Regions:
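Sec-dependent N-terminal signal peptides
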Residues: 4-13, 18
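Beta-sheet-dominated interaction scaffolds and their linkers
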Residues: 19-48, 128-144
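Extracellular/lumenal ectodomain signal focusing on beta-strand-rich modules
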Residues: 37, 61-63, 102
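Short, solvent-exposed loop/turn segments enriched in Ser/Thr/Gly
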Residues: 42-48, 95-102
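Asparagine-centered strand-capping/turn motif at beta-strand->loop junctions
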Residues: 51-55
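Surface-exposed binding patches on compact interaction domains or structured appendages
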Residues: 56-85
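Short, hydrophobic beta-strand segments
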Residues: 88-95
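Terminal connector regions
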Residues: 98-131
Length: 144
């Protein structure tokens, strides 16, 4: 009899504590996009994070906020239906140097603490190498 009571309590708890509601899952590993090493003048700095609502209710992104003004995120304006994907665009101002920025996404998702999840960008922006045409001319095989 004790076994039946225990099994009943476990089943009731499983049903009661099952998370219902919207859930956010990002496509990128560790919620991070790696720019790699990019030339300042050859890259717009725009990247897109894709996510899926794996829950059973519409997912609403209420806010996206960057750690600095050099990174400008934009959020979807419409709710994301269960099973559908959404996008968060991130535009980084291509300043020379390392990229290490965090964007906080706030939503009604039940699978992340307080509906917040951090997404990140990383990489390095370099100046385009300057080619010295005079040096090239001196080492040209035709000049020998």
């Amino acid at each position: 009899m004790k076994k039946y009571i225990l099994i009943t309590v476990i089943l009731i708890n499983a049903v009661v504590f099952a998370q219902k509601g919207p859930k956010i899952e990002f496509k990128d590993k560790d919620n991070t996009i790696d720019y790699g090493t990019v030339n300042k003048d050859d890259d717009s700095g725009l990247r897109t994070f894709e996510f899926t609502n794996t829950g059973d209710e519409p997912l609403i992104i209420t806010n996206v906020q960057s750690t600095c003004g050099c990174t400008v995120p934009s959020k979807p304006t419409e709710p994301i239906a269960p099973g559908k994907t959404g996008k968060i665009d991130v535009k980084y101002n291509m300043h020379t140097g390392p990229i290490r920025k965090t964007i906080t996404v706030e939503s009604n998702a039940v699978n992340v603490e307080e509906g917040r999840v951090a997404i990140k960008i990383k990489g390095e922006v370099i100046e385009k190498p300057v080619v010295n045409l005079l040096e090239k001319k001196k080492t040209s095989p035709m000049m020998q």
